[in-house]
């Protein structure tokens, strides 16, 4: 087996350093690559991590000189032994920290697409391409830069093809998206598990600067239609997403929530979760009551009783008593009668208030 000094010598010679004749360079490089390929094959079949760690360095060293060699490593990963997979995942980040991002991007996207030959694309469930994306994203953040535009565009273009794993591939890139890209990827994010979804929304909200301002993110979530067409998302996931935003009180402040809701209540048709968000805003921000009254007035002017939101509207008004008395008085007679019939406690309070007003 080759020791570290030998590895460095072979790599140096393969790159042509100190070799005068091109023919000699080609011959040495071919031998180095052939031996490295054999070592890679043996490493991926190794049953012990120690053996895999002993055989991989030559191949990884040559990847420094020829990043396109990453393709074979990525392609062979899924069929490798458990020990080899663990070793590759341990060693790969160190390599990716030093390779040109553009070169890694080209190899990674080609493998995800199944290019350039007829070989099947990498499995979307494989941890290796996801690991590579996270390493590149962390590196870009640490360096105060960004990831290559080709990486962002390429991964987002593959999100739908990657099925349920598509959202996970977008997560590392969220801080680097522009507004239109962030909006486009939201449906895929909402197909993540609840915990991953919460982390993804936090990554969007805490990015500097965020691709979507907090109020814009809330608005876009309300614009998504549950299980309706290509952009449809599971209703439970949409509820979880909006609630996760509301729970991020440092980012989604009272002002951000009410500003977003002022836009939501003007939408036509009114989003299905409008009243739920208003109620949760009241619960999380009791001092938002005055702003909420303004939202409820707007909805009443828009004849909210003719929509599916009416039940939630009445519930919200009952929660807001006594501030909401005027809203009950402004309801059409038939709707007021039905609302009071289902909430006799509110009826008693309104009657008592009316009597007090007459007595005064």
Predicted features, each with a name:
Residues 1-360:
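Eukaryotic alpha-helical solenoid repeat scaffolds
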